[in-house]
A protein has these predicted regions:
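Acidic/His- and Gly-rich active-site-bordering loop/insert found
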Residues: 1-75, 96-101
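Acidic/histidine-rich catalytic neighborhood of metal-dependent amide-processing enzymes
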Residues: 71, 78-146
Length: 146
């Protein structure tokens, strides 16, 4: 995997990891904590969607069509773009209030959750980025951590 990074506001670092053969980028945004010796927190989201069948939609699936009563329809908005936005809005609001986390927080967007994660996330966890930093918690769907 190749990688490159950009820094935003001198606090948030965004890294792009891409499997050169597949063109499926993993995006990791990092908010460095005040105590880097502590284990990191990883919040995961995905940017892929299940296949679209346009004839089953009232509005074009990728249009983010807003109805007169305020509903917005778009493929992937609930699974799972909204969660990634929640993460970033929470970070933005916490930073605005002057909050500094003790632990480093990584927000990830992976490209292939809907098809098993073998081309993106699986390759990303094999990189040096993960070594000694993160202990992912993986649960089966609908497990609710039971």
């Amino acid at each position: 995997m190749c990688s490159r990074s950009v820094t935003v506001n001198c606090i948030i670092v965004t890294s792009f990891f891409e499997n050169e053969n597949l063109g499926k980028p993993c995006i990791v945004t990092t908010w460095v904590g005040s105590d880097p010796s502590l284990g990191s927190i990883m919040l995961n989201s995905h940017i892929d969607v299940v296949p679209v069948f346009p004839d089953q939609w009232d509005h074009p699936p990728f249009s983010a069509h807003k109805t007169e009563d305020g509903w917005i329809y778009g493929r992937g908005t609930q699974d799972m773009k909204c969660v990634g936005i929640w993460y970033m809005e929470a970070i933005r609001n916490l930073k605005k209030q002057g909050f500094q986390p003790k632990r480093t927080i990584h927000v990830m967007w992976v490209p292939d959750e809907e098809i098993g994660g073998h081309d993106g996330m699986e390759k990303l966890i094999e990189t040096d980025f993960f070594k000694g930093k993160i202990c992912p918690l993986v649960t089966p769907p609908k497990s609710n951590f039971q």
